Regions:
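N-terminal helix-turn-helix DNA-binding core of bacterial DNA-binding proteins
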Residues: 1-40, 51-53, 62-68, 94
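Short, hydrophobic-biased segments on the C-terminal half of alpha helices
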Residues: 45-46
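Short beta-strand "wing" residues that participate in macromolecule-binding interfaces
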Residues: 56
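Amphipathic alpha-helical dimerization/coiled-coil segments
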Residues: 62, 71-94
Length: 94
């Protein structure tokens, strides 16, 4: 459950998704995640690095093999999410 706790934190999945697209430094990653504060980004990067999902090399964050495996494991959820959004207009009931 610790992994689900980490992934449920605000911006964690977005960071993983962005780094799956390509490695990025802190400022570039903050630019890609437009509304994320630098303090939240710093915290999430530390948590994801501590969980061995990311590493920092040559001033760029990138997914580790564990991080790549995680993103691949989440692919079916991403596909389901796209179908759900198409069918519902992306609006949650409430």
């Amino acid at each position: 459950m610790a992994a689900l706790d980490l992934l449920g934190r605000r911006w964690a999945l977005r960071i993983l998704w962005e780094l799956h697209q390509s490695p990025a430094g802190f400022r570039e990653l903050q630019r890609r995640c437009e509304r994320m504060s630098s303090s939240v980004l710093s915290t999430r990067l530390g948590e994801l690095t501590g969980a061995r999902l990311l590493d920092l090399r040559d001033d760029s964050y990138r997914l580790t093999p564990l991080g790549e495996d995680l993103v691949e494991a989440l692919s079916p959820l991403n596909a389901w999410s796209a179908r759900w959004a198409a069918e519902t207009g992306g609006e949650a009931a409430g």
